[in-house]
Amino acid sequence: MSSFACWSLSLLILFYSPGSGEKAFEVYIWSEKQIVEATESWKINCSTNCAAPDMGGLETPTNKIMLEEHPQGKWKQFLVSNVSKDTVFFCHFTCSGKQHSESLNIRVYQPPAQVTLKLQPPRVFVGEDFTIECTVSPVQPLERLTLSLLRGRETLKNQTFGGAETVPQEATATFNSTALKKDGLNFSCQAELDLRPHGGYIIRSISEYQILEVYEPMQDNQMVIIIVVVSILLFLFVTSVLLCFIFGQHWHRRRTGTYGVLAAWRRLPRAFRARPV
């Protein structure tokens, strides 16, 4: 045997020997999606390059159903569902008494289902301050969320949120402004959840439009006219009340006052009518 053949045989023995530290076979895991919504289901494939694996499968704390399997068990396809949080999945196979596994982290997202916008106060005069407040229902992952406060088509503020939260979180953005004449426009808030870094897409949700009612301050002459008119109306009202009271008293006296006393005096006997000297 040539030296080259001996050297090649030695490498093969070293490669397949249990103590060589090299992997005798490979395990692969593939997911239909890298990020999923908590309510959806998707497919995961587990496969190996072992020609005749002893056994294999998918380890997961969630619900799973095996859909298909290779006749020799070289690959298996599963339908996974009911994932409520970020989860690590493991594909494992046993080949010639040796076991090997591969893992895959699947992220879970929750879209911005409800976006609410409030104007505080909803009615202002030109030059007064007001606040725009936008609140979004629990979202995950929060670090991929952007809230945009809009006046018409103009963006007033974009707010992002840091930190990698493991559970859905509410988010709020506020913007303080001074009312202008042009502020009688529609205000709105847009929530954007960007899942592209995780193999997903952009999810957008927008609030109902809110209109800020802006009033012009009254001029001095207008205020004077209003005060004069109100004063005249108040004077006429008070005068009419007093006249009604006076005429009512006069009518009452005519009915029960002077004429009543005179009639009673005439009914007295003549002896009692004499006036003392």
UniProtKB/Swiss-Prot annotation:
The keyword Zinc-finger does not apply. Residues 39-98, 127-196 form the Ig-like C2-type domain. Residues 1-22 form the signal peptide. It is a single-pass type I membrane protein. GO terms for biological process: cell-cell adhesion. It is found in: Membrane; Cell projection, Microvillus. This is Intercellular adhesion molecule 2.
